[in-house]
Every structure is written in structure tokens, then in C-alpha cells.
Amino acid sequence: MKLSKKSLITFLLAFYSFIGYAQVIDHWETVIYNTDQWSYFVGNSEPNANWANTSFNTSSWSKGSGGIGYEDEDDNTIIPQTRSLYIRTNFTLVDASVIKYIVLNADYDDAFVAYLNGTEIARSNIGTVGVRPSYNTYADTYHEANLYQGGLPEDYIFNEAEFKSLISSGTNTLAIQIHNNSPSSSDLSSNFFLSLGISDQSKNYRENPSWFQAPTGPQVSLLDVKLPIVVITTENNIEIQNEPKVTAQMGI
């Protein structure tokens, strides 16, 4: 079987994407756990318009350990039955410049929208991107949480180009609104984690959850790989095949 020029290029891109990722990320740490202390607002009315911003004063909000919700036995803070819930927590970044990837792990019932320092970064199962759902908006469909059943949370992966303008060294805020899918819904879950891909050997945060899986492969943007292009020129322009040896020169 012959290896076409297109296949060779695809192989090289995949290979150098992996190598570049390995060089960019030294290790992963987790800066937010689901069980951290969160400020929360039960959605019986609309929250303050600035509720997701770092500058918002949460003194009038309740406080509790996440997850926050009811039923399913995956909640550390129990709340009354509700159509929506708003939660937020601050976290401190020692040096934002060494953070190259961020992973938001989300385990929820039934829908959510997440904001980083007031800017939407992820949503699932509700509404239109960029439009904040009102407190009385229901999820598009039913969605069950996974962790309490032995499953894994969903992951939302962001490279540096996507979050660089959103974070800074010092205090930052992760804010999330969670919505049920019907007035009679029997449960609500809100378990969220935030993990960081760090480019140096500094250790300023916490170990990753045991189930955490660092992103690899196509989830890593080739735009982040600052490596030279490898050019292979075969002798007499012979097409590369799988088995026969081919005399070639590799150059940059």
C-alpha cells in the first residue's frame, strides 16, 4: 500500500500537534472543585444584571459547599425545588501567562450557561449562544447528571487564544446558571470543576480529580504549535510506500 502525499501531510500535522502540545503543557492542576464554597441565588426571580461579573457584591446571596441542588444524592447543599439556580465562586491565578489551556468539567441537570469574568464561555441544552436565559426559562430537553452514576462529567476545552483576554493574574470569577427542564422536575444538579494546563513547573493549585483526563489530539489547536515544517524529499521523487525502503533527505 502506498502512502499518498496527502496522508503524509496529515500524519505530520497530527504528529507535530501532539509534540507541540507536550512542549506547551508541563502539567495540569485544578483551581476550582465542585465542593468549594460557592455563592448561590435560587431562581425565584431575576438576579442582578451584573451577577456574573467579578465586581458583583454577593453579600446578599446564600453560601454553601457545591454541588448545590436537590435529589440524586450528589448535592452538598440542598435547596428547595426551583426552575433555575445561579452560582459563582472566585479563584486566584498566581501567573495567568503560564496558563495555556483551560478545561471546564460540567456535571449538571438539566442545562447550564457558564461565564468567565462575565463573558459566556460554555452552555448546554438551553437557548441561543450569547443570549442569557431568563430565570424562568426551562432547559431545551431533559439531561441527567453523570458523576453520581459512576460516569464522567462533560468537558469544555479552551486554548490560550480563546481565553487570554478574559483572565488575569489575581482574582477571577466563574459564574454559572443552571436550569431545570420542567416545573415538576424532581432534581437539579450543579457540579463544576475548572482545571488549568500550565506551561512551567510551578505548583500553585490543587491535584486534578481522579477521573480527570488531559485533552489530547484534535482538541489541541495547531495554531499553538510553534515548530518548523518538516520537508521530506525522496531521491528521484519516488512516491513513499509502506514497506520498501526509500532513500530520502529530511530538512527544515
Protein language model annotation of sequence segments:
Residues 24-54, 221-225:
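GGW-centered surface loops in extracellular recognition modules
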Residues 38, 61, 83, 91, ...:
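Aromatic-lined ligand-binding clefts that engage carbohydrates, nucleic acids, or primary amines
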Residues 54-90:
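Surface-exposed, low-complexity/disordered Ser/Thr/Gly/Pro/Asn-rich loops and linkers
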Residues 119-160:
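Exoplasmic/lumenal beta-rich domain surfaces
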Residues 188-252:
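Phosphate-handling architecture centered on phosphoinositide signaling
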